[in-house]
Amino acid sequence: QEDQAGNRYLYLNEGQGIHSQWNPTQIAFRRTWDFFLSAPYFNATPHTADQVDSLLIIGLAAGTIARQYSAVYPTIPMDGIEIDGGIVEAGARYFDMNADVMPTLTVYVEDGRYMLNQINKQYSVIAIDAYRPPYIPWHLTTVEFFSEVRTHLSDDGVVAINVGRTPSDRRLVDALTATMLEVFPTVHAMDVPESFNTILVATVQPTIADNLIRNRDGLAANAQTNPILRDT
């Protein structure tokens, strides 16, 4: 779907949620995907942009997260896993998910957990955007799954997950937080304004929420910081 402003949206599951957004002149949208850019900066200060050196996306959809990371970190290798080949085709056709715009992105059409077990790499960031209510892939919510994620993270790695909720029902957010805390020392929660989404960020190292504020201040003060990252 495309609106009058030139925004294209990918709707799935009876149109209950927007899973990708694209605009020819805009990268960041102040929506859920932008919060994934903040995830590495929960690490201890100073954590700088050059310390983010790789990304894995489980639930690639049509590539909004990949496009943002490619714009901010143009040289880092990115792997994206998407179970639906039709969505990948739509991403290439309508959302610029191609080698010209994202030259470092490798796409795998496969189940996220299966493909994770086939990849022998570690990443700075693993982004999971595969929970698409009302269809939650429960095999991506277990202690065993998050243990597998942990083995694929670098020493200062983070995993960020988009979780759906309602204003009065945070049971899934709370349950996932408890599960992740069985594997990771710290889990942070960021509620996305004007949405029914919470981004959970788990860190390999013990961390505090104030790290994000301090790192953002450092990025803002650095003239070399990409404006997309500075404004996120």
Q: Where are the model-predicted features located?
A:
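The AdoMet/dcAdoMet-binding core of the Class I SAM-like
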Residues: 4, 27-160, 168-177, 181-183, ...
